[in-house]
């Protein structure tokens, strides 16, 4: 089992002839979209709609192949110049199709009898997708403005995002006489030694000083772009735009936030009690948020034992899920360990066009890392279930995306707690759950 993922199923590298061929095909497909956008007529709506869907599917497949390879390559090495160049090239080509995309969206939004075309086999699976475009027409800008926004994003919000990622992923932290990646130092927040937790926290904060202004500048400009675009499109706020794009109503969000606010006093009580158990009288220091309580589970996991643990616990629930987990470990879907230049945190990238996913994590061998992998493999399972969908139906909103992953977390944590007989270890496990919930609700 390799500790690094393989991207060979996409391309062998940026010098792979197939990468160049697909890049050329992608550019041609963008031009084809532009040409198609100039031939539309409401006298031939069904015929036009069929052609739009066909070309968009082909465009989507090429873009996914190319962009996934670029972004995944860069996520494990943010200094990879070839990856950065490829990402910019793909984004630039995609932006040339933005005007055509706006024309298609406006054309669909103006259709009077859209649903009458959606019974045919080629379009029936896209009923939701096409109706969503139809209903979102009021937020469209002119074709020229849509094109300008897409092109400017490459050197605006997208560029600021890349800068923030590069600065934090390449940051080295001076700790205990050594230089460590930021992700490794942040993992020390879970150490059993209070002095280690405090020293790591202070070292982390100190390391931010040289990049603090640049990161703040990046984040502020990302948000400014969102605020500006939301206003231009006619949304009442960035939140209104996000809710619309996520297919969540304000009423639903208000209900969720209301429930969270109702239970905040319970979390405050938990944090005060944790502070007392750790010997603090005036509340819990920030660097102690992840301090272990009770007895830590002594098991230290490797990728091999993590695979066995997850597969054994998910097999009784779902053979499909367990089989997919085995494939992920055996076929190099996962990039495990932190190192300089690798982005922090964890994520899953679905690649339904090759019937696989890729998972990045900063594995340190603790139970929390096992839970993180269960979470990310939940996203991969979601990817497994969209493989049979047509390309334009592969996208889904965040509320949907987090369903399988959060479910997986609960499955694994509940199983671990039930299997533990030592009360102090059980306390530690329950506290781990409370930590996670506290981050979601309070942070």
Where are these regions (language model features)?
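Conserved helix-loop functional segments at active or binding sites
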Residues: 312, 316-323, 349, 379-390, ...
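Active-site recognition of the HExxH zinc-binding catalytic motif
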Residues: 234, 364-383, 405
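Short pre-active-site segment immediately N-terminal to the catalytic Zn-binding motif
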Residues: 298-303, 354-374
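Post-HEXXH active-site segment of zinc metalloproteases
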Residues: 371-372, 383-407
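A well-structured
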Residues: 1-295, 307
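Catalytic zinc-binding patch centered on the HExxH motif and its immediate surroundings
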Residues: 299-301, 334-356
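Active-site-adjacent bridging/hinge elements
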Residues: 235-236, 240, 283-285, 347-356, ...
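Long, amphipathic alpha-helical stalk/connector segments used for oligomerization, subunit docking
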Residues: 414-443
């Amino acid at each position: 089992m390799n500790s690094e993922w393989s991207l060979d199923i996409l391309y062998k590298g940026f010098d792979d002839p197939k990468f160049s061929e697909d890049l050329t095909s992608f550019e041609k497909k963008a031009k084809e979209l532009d040409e198609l956008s100039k031939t539309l007529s409401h006298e031939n709506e069904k015929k036009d709609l069929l052609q739009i869907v066909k070309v968009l599917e082909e465009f989507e497949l090429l873009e996914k192949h190319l962009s996934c390879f670029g972004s995944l390559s860069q996520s494990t090495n943010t200094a990879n110049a070839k990856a950065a160049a490829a990402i910019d090239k793909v984004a630039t080509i995609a932006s040339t199709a933005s005007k055509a995309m706006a024309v298609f969206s406006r054309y669909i939004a103006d259709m009077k009898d859209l649903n009458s075309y959606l019974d045919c086999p080629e379009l029936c699976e896209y009923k939701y997708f096409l109706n969503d475009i139809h209903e979102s027409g009021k937020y469209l800008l002119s074709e020229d403005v849509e094109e300008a926004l897409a092109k400017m994003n490459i050197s605006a919000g997208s560029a600021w995002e890349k800068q923030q990622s590069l600065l934090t992923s390449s940051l080295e932290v001076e700790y205990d006489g050594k230089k460590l990646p930021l992700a490794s130092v942040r993992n020390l927040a879970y150490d059993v030694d209070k002095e280690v937790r405090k020293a790591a926290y202070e070292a982390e904060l100190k390391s931010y000083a040289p990049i603090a202004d640049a990161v703040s500048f990046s984040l502020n400009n990302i948000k400014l772009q969102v605020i500006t675009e939301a206003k231009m499109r006619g949304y009442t706020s960035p939140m209104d735009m996000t809710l619309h794009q996520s297919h969540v109503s304000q009423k639903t969000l208000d209900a969720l936030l209301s429930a969270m606010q109702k239970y905040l006093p319970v979390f405050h009580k938990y944090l005060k009690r944790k502070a007392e158990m750790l010997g603090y009288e005036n509340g819990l220091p920030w660097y102690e948020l992840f301090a272990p309580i009770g007895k830590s589970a002594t098991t230290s996991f490797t990728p091999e034992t993590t695979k066995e643990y997850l597969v054994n616990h998910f097999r009784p629930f779902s053979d499909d899920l367990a089989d997919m987990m085995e494939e992920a470990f055996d076929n190099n879907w996962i990039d495990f360990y932190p190192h300089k230049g690798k982005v922090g945190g964890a994520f899953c990238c679905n690649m339904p066009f090759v019937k696989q996913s890729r998972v990045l994590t900063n594995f340190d061998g603790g139970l929390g890392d096992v839970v993180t992998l269960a979470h990310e493999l939940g996203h991969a399972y979601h990817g497994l279930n969209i493989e049979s969908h047509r390309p334009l139906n592969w996208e889904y909103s965040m509320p949907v995306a987090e369903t399988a992953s959060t479910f997986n977390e609960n499955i694994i944590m509940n199983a671990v707690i039930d299997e533990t007989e030592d009360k102090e270890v059980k306390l530690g496990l329950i506290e781990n759950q409370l930590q996670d919930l506290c981050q979601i609700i309070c942070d």
